[in-house]
Amino acid sequence: MNKSIVILGGGTAGWMSALFFKKAYPQSKVTVVESEEIGIIGVGESTTPYFIEMLDFLDINVLDILKASDIAFKTGVKFDGWGKSIFYHPFNLNDEHYNHDTALIQYYLKNKNTNVFKTLNPLVAITEQGKIQKIKKNLPHNDFAVHIDACKTSIALKSIALSRGIQLVQGVVGSVDVKDNNVASLILNSGYRVCGDFFVDCSGFNRVLANKFNIKFLKFNDLLTNTAIPCPIKKTFFEPYTTAKTLNYGWTWKIPTHSRTGTGYVFSRDYTDTDSAKKEFYTYLKTVTDEEINLNKIIFFETGTLEKIHFNNVLAVGLASHFLEPLEGTSLAISVIILFEFIKQKEDFNNKVLQKILQIKDFIVLHYLTKKTQSNFWLDASKKARENNLIQKLLSSKTLNFDLFKDNDHYFSFLNHLNFLQNLDAIDTNTSVSTEHYKTDFNYKELLKSKAWHYSHVKNAVDYKTYYEQFL
């Protein structure tokens, strides 16, 4: 790898990238160019297990930075108002039994079980009881994630990075010097020049380096939201999950950390004005807390991705590379995917990452396949979802088609999609699975084994609040 790597931008994405490149290429000089004048947007506070995998790769134990980063544990997402009733999208338990014999899934489907995940994954029952699985030092990567305070996590990662020899240059980039169609240096407003062999664009929505090379931004027109009103509140909730609750023109997030709760309203300005959205969000927040509410910060965004994540001698990471609304907390996950895929140095890197982002986008679109009629926003969002190619294939199959996901390279599995199709009441629940890919017959002993496994996990779960406070 190149001798000198320059990261443009701090924040979680910037310092995470710096640590990643230093670990992957220990002989390289890594420099972060950061400006306190610009600051960070502070999104991406609900993560997925990919964040834990990244920390593990960087030799950072999440338990060691828990206090500094105001981290709280997360086992999934609670959806309120999206379907006929509240439902959960839990992470998968890291247990070989969760690679369920497909005959078991067939059994539950044929018996019209409306929530396969609730039956097959004990994390739902555990979460509903306000409990959590005990988390061990040798942490598995797919059964839990964390809620973070983006600013505090950025500071914690920065501290670790500086202790590992990563350099910091403070200042605002005024111009970019390009030679032979590659970035040669970043020129700060002070006149100081930061030279490098390879550059990582973590400049957020500004996309400084991507714009310098006129990299095309692919808009996701089947996702309608374009505005967010973030509002952290002091009240805390000992809930090991993110809550996504629908309002008239979008949805709200609730992300509890140790010392506060991140909340926000994601909506579309094409269906309501910002002042009306503030009033609606304010009314909702007053049902959650009685504290003073500040709704002055507004984030305008465009959903989509760069056509090329790696171009010339530049790699785009974080908001500089893409943006998807945070329904499943995939922002940092996609950044981790970009970094891991990049160090593999495959020729099809751009296409592989683009396909992964598109797959995740399709899954986010699936969330809007609702029967909500409270506004034109929800009617149009549902219409857009039904026009999505993957969703059309899922809905048009006479039987639920596992083969759509048989390459096993999807970030979200068939069961993830099935969970939403059923809970959003988008398909009949008396469906069965019948493909050449799965031929096993139902075995009653396997059903008993499944129930015993399910019960043992629920039985061994502990009170979340008590367990969490042991770490503080």
Region spans (language model):
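Dinucleotide-binding Rossmann-like beta1-alpha1 core, especially the glycine-rich loop
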Residues: G39, V43-E128
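Long, low-complexity C-terminal extensions of enzymes
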Residues: F73, Q345-L472
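A conserved active-site cap/scaffold subdomain adjacent to cofactor or substrate pockets
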Residues: V266, L295-N351
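Glycine-rich FAD pyrophosphate-binding loop
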Residues: K22-V43
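Conserved FAD/dinucleotide-binding core of flavoprotein oxidoreductases
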Residues: L247-F300, H322-A333
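N-terminal Rossmann-fold NAD(P) dinucleotide-binding loop
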Residues: G14
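Predominantly flavin-linked oxidoreductase catalytic cores and closely associated redox partners
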Residues: L139-A277
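Beta1/beta-strand and adjacent pyrophosphate-binding region of the FAD-binding site
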Residues: N2-G11
